[in-house]
């Protein structure tokens, strides 16, 4: 399924990040080590990431002074995934690295192949609303960071959401992926069943427990109003990850499997499930 923004409207690329601080001579090493640790635990727990084994990583800074980095994962010259790492302030201590997003497949965020040409484009990361900001003479244009599609000129970005998440909702240093579950092994197109288009304002909210304990084969769709609801983007939910029993991530299909924090997904979107019936004996992993 190819997501189109028109469907619904309403090396280390710069060595290790060129933001290394003189007062933190070990920053590069800490960053590199942490990324490798996260990659290792993902590969060990989820076979969908097997191509990450013995993969090469390159990183680049996302925007000036944003404290966010895109990590490109390649193996044998092929793109096999990516991670987005943030840096969270810690009073009196070194800033803490946090895992904002990660994905597997040949398409990553802010791929040079899809970058706007012949114009200056600034990468802006904010989960599903990630985009290149292109300053044209007559207006500002937003270009989707995953597909390279330009949004209509009327679309404007809002305040970032993913940076408002508390660290407790994100994977942090030394934490491991402790549980993984595949809801659907086959790629699903949310447009095959469009019940999510109906008014669902009175439906019960689908919780993390509902998702994890789901025993039926019906699809789960996450709908996300983007850019002040000018765009409605539906995503098929494929997998679930749980880090150290507290940080939950939802894997959706978006030109590849893309994991974002569950807390972020709940802030920006709504889950739709045909049936979230679960066995009474089911339990969440520790």
Where do the PLM segments sit?
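A eukaryote-biased signal for long
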Residues: 177-286
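A short, surface-exposed interaction/processing loop segment used at functional sites
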Residues: 83-129, 143-179, 254-286
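Bacterial N-terminal signal peptides
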Residues: 7-15
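Short, non-transmembrane alpha-helical segments in secretory-pathway proteins
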Residues: 23-63, 103-121, 167-223
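Bacterial N-terminal signal peptides that target proteins for export
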Residues: 1-6
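N-terminal short leaders/motifs
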Residues: 22-33, 75-84, 91
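Sec/Tat signal peptide C-region and signal peptidase I cleavage site
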Residues: 16-22
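Exposed beta-strand-loop-beta-strand "reactive/processing" segments of non-cytosolic proteins
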Residues: 47-89, 125-142, 240, 251
């Amino acid at each position: 399924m190819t997501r189109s923004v028109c469907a619904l409207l309403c090396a280390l690329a710069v060595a290790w990040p060129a933001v290394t601080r003189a007062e933190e001579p070990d920053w590069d090493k800490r960053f590199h080590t942490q990324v490798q640790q996260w990659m290792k635990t993902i590969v060990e727990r989820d076979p969908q990431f097997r191509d990450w084994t013995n993969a090469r990583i390159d990183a680049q800074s996302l925007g000036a002074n944003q404290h966010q980095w895109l990590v490109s994962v390649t193996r044998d010259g092929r793109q096999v995934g990516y991670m987005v790492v943030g840096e969270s302030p810690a009073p009196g201590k070194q800033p803490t690295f946090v895992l904002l997003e990660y994905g597997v497949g040949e398409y990553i965020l802010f791929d040079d192949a899809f970058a706007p040409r012949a114009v200056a484009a600034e990468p802006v990361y904010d989960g599903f609303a990630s985009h290149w900001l292109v300053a044209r003479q007559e207006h500002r244009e937003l270009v989707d960071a995953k597909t390279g599609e330009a949004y209509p000129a009327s679309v404007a970005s809002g305040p970032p959401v993913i940076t408002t998440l508390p660290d407790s909702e994100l994977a942090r240093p030394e934490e491991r992926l402790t549980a993984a579950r595949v809801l659907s092994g086959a790629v699903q197109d949310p447009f095959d069943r469009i019940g999510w288009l109906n008014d669902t304002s009175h439906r019960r909210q689908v919780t993390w427990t509902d998702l994890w304990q789901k025993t039926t084969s019906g699809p789960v769709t996450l709908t996300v109003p983007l850019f002040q609801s000018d765009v409605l983007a539906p995503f098929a939910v494929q997998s679930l990850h749980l880090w150290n029993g507290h940080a939950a991530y939802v894997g959706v299909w978006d030109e590849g499997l893309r994991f974002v924090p569950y807390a972020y997904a709940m802030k920006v979107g709504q889950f739709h499930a045909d049936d979230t019936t679960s066995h009474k004996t089911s339990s969440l992993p520790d």
